[in-house]
């Protein structure tokens, strides 16, 4: 291991910790987040210990996620800095694990109504807290995932291992997003999505810059090499800045409410965090406008100047992190009372945390909105990057069909509407509306996205790398050509997954999980999109695929899928048992059809509406078949024009030989 690595990491940690500690103490004093509790006060150690430990949890997560991101997207696997990034990731994940243990204990001390005593009942009560309460289970999951990341990072040295460890590190932040202010707010699902998105991209931003500093101070790369690292990180930092800003505004909007509430203690801390974010954005602009150019030109002292800016930025990031931890312990202007604690709660509030919306009308599919920031950002960035790819090809004179761009943009717009508008809102209360969203997510949107040929565009528009690192192009092509996706992308396998998942999802606890838990809801959307995309790609995909089944087989698969959809729809239409009766049957709706009739309406939608995309698939398969035959005939005609019809000549010679007729002399 590089002997300068630990001193460099210590310097980075010190810079972050200085800003974090100062901002946290000032924030707790301003917002009253560490004031003694009126009942069963656990003491100052727990009151100050919880926000401090939680801040270290996020700091450790930033180090692990940011370092793994740099290894996956920035650093060459041949470079010594690659191994250093994994060491930093292991240290960060270990810090997250230990800090999560302390956070879980301090949370237990605060919510436990009796003074904590280490007697014979302590273990029993602690385990009841960890296994029997939502907040306890959340901390337990975070501890387990962080510990797993620590072990995994120590063991792996491959890109695949880095990718898996990175996913687990990101997943460890989800339980934290469901705690704090997001747990009690009325807009629970938008708050959780915004908090999770904010945490992940803040971790990428902070941890990535920390790794840049570690590389500069421990490996001392030449200016040109450091320019490559910093320029790649700068692009990631720009995206992270935009996402952190958007998610921060969303969080503030959900918790501050009226503009006058900005004069509260919570509003003052939000304003301070906005100032820190603006200053960090200015530092990012300085990188992209001046410092990177100086490094590229080899200006003497440019690396030293850049690192002074990096050091100041790290301290400022610590300030922003400290303010965030203080905000998490500060009372919000918008009251946060879970529905289960309301004196009088409606069935809808108990189940969903929200009041029952007005009676549904189909116009509300467009007029009713509830922001899901995660999917809104995915849609925006997917459109922006696709259009950028199209324009980049056009700029260098390469043609790209406009129809593909229209298909991709249309699919993404429909995805944004489906996840953020009326279908997403009312699907929670009406099975029929949920089924409309299902058909669109699994059939209409994937077909449009497949026709956009995103892999082909990415392979043409994104420059490849030659230094042993993996950029977006390398990751996309590696995924496309992996054996795993090759197996899942086989038409028969994709068809089985697409059809069988209907039965498995709706007639298992998965459906209940998707309704009751926001994580389950997000998984449901991803599953519908992924299974539909694999199915459509295997049949009519433009992007390269290892499988090229004959067109008659493709048509048979489409027809079989239509039959399976009809069977599924009929089972719902004539079924007399209610799916998830403890949800749809207990919602307390006084408008619309009764739950069983609504479910039967959903069956009609699954049968009728689902046939339109399937019919479109069948038409596209037939059209592709026809075009394939035309291309084959044209190739044959060109070959005949060039060398003659050798097959026909051989056949005629065989007939003449059988008839005893001598061969005719060839012309020319």
Language-model-derived ranges and their functions:
Residues 1-668:
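Alpha-helical membrane segments of multi-pass proteins
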